[in-house]
């Protein structure tokens, strides 16, 4: 049975266009934005409010606390279960998000090496005590050909965890399989000038709509996990509340990181084969193109 994946950079209109499509084609939304998995992180993740969802069922949103760490392997299994459930209801699953590995885990049915919480905890503790550079050096001694940024703590720790558990090269994801032929992939792109304006407005709206207060409440309610505390926008708000940076600097840093994220997302999804590329510079024109793609795919006259 067919499913649809809306992918693309932040700011290209995935949430709104997929919502329109789900409304017109009897669909459910399955979130594939890793940060929207977290409860109470609403403003800085651009999570649609319940009223904005227009009654369209949404899955894989608000499923873990910000004190926990999301797992792409667990997410894949949960998302696949959601998709099967939606098909059983004779509805169409719309997988929507810009978190490349999360999308790919479902669309390409990625297979992940095992995990070991005890090993992970030992590595996390060592990184806290000695610095991630020590673990990075060890990783390169074990596997000189493995490429990872010295500051990428999560990937370094995961790579060492895999190496220790399996005794093999620490490739965090097993080789990419061909895209499942039951996924229609719609990659949303946008004119760079338009996207830059959208991202600037997006960041302004975060702060205008109360991101600082949201973060203050999060800190009161939870001991934030590493991922939540380092999320774009949230990291800057935490620094502002700690008196480390000004609000203006927090906004500027959030915008620059958002732009870098968008560029990474564009490069990631560009690699997908067999996709439909839709330019969302004009949203109304884009949706007509999307309707045409879906009508043909589902043979609706």
From Swiss-Prot:
The record marks 99, 120 as: Interaction with substrate tRNA. Its EC number is 2.5.1.75. The lineage of its organism: Bacteria, Bacillati, Actinomycetota, Actinomycetes, Micrococcales. The keyword Transcription regulation does not apply. The gene is miaA. Substrate binds at residues 10-15. GO terms for molecular function: ATP binding; tRNA dimethylallyltransferase activity. Residues 33-36 are annotated as: Interaction with substrate tRNA. The keyword Disulfide bond does not apply. Belongs to the IPP transferase family. This is tRNA dimethylallyltransferase. HAMAP family: IPP_trans. It comes from the Bacteria. NCBIfam families: miaA (TIGR00174). InterPro entries: Dimethylallyltransferase, IPT, P-loop_NTPase. Keywords: ATP-binding, Magnesium, Nucleotide-binding, Transferase, tRNA processing. Monomer. Its cofactor is Mg(2+). GO terms for biological process: tRNA modification. Catalyzes the transfer of a dimethylallyl group onto the adenine at position 37 in tRNAs that read codons beginning with uridine, leading to the formation of N6-(dimethylallyl)adenosine (i(6)A). ATP binds at residues 8-15.
């Amino acid at each position: 049975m067919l499913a649809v994946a809306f992918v693309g950079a932040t700011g290209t209109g995935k949430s709104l266009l997929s919502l329109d499509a789900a409304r017109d084609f009897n669909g459910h939304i399955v979130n594939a934005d890793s940060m929207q998995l977290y409860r109470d992180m609403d403003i800085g993740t651009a999570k649609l409010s319940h009223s904005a969802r227009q009654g369209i069922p949404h899955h894989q949103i608000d499923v873990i606390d910000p004190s926990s760490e999301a797992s792409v392997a667990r997410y894949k299994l949960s998302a696949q279960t959601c998709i099967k459930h939606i098909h059983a209801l004779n509805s169409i699953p719309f997988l929507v998000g810009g978190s490349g590995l999360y999308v790919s885990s479902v669309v390409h049915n990625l297979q992940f090496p095992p995990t070991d919480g005890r090993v992970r905890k030992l590595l996390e503790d060592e990184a806290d005590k000695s610095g991630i550079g020590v673990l990075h050096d060890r990783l390169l001694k074990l596997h000189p050909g493995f490429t990872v940024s010295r500051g990428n703590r999560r990937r370094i720790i995961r790579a060492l965890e895999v190496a220790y558990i399996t005794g093999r090269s620490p490739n965090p994801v097993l080789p990419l399989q061909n895209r499942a032929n039951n996924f229609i992939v719609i990659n949303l792109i946008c004119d760079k000038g338009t996207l830059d304006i959208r991202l600037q407005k997006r960041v302004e709206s975060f702060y205008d709509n109360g991101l600082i207060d949201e973060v203050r409440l999060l800190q009161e309610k939870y001991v934030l996990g590493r991922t939540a505390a380092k999320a774009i926008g949230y990291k800057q708000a935490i620094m502002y509340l700690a008196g480390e940076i000004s609000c203006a600097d927090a906004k500027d840093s959030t915008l620059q990181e958002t732009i870098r994220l968008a560029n990474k997302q564009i490069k990631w999804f560009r690699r997908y084969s067999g996709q439909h590329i839709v330019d969302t510079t004009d949203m109304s024109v884009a949706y007509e193109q999307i309707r045409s793609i879906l009508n043909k795919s589902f043979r609706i006259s």
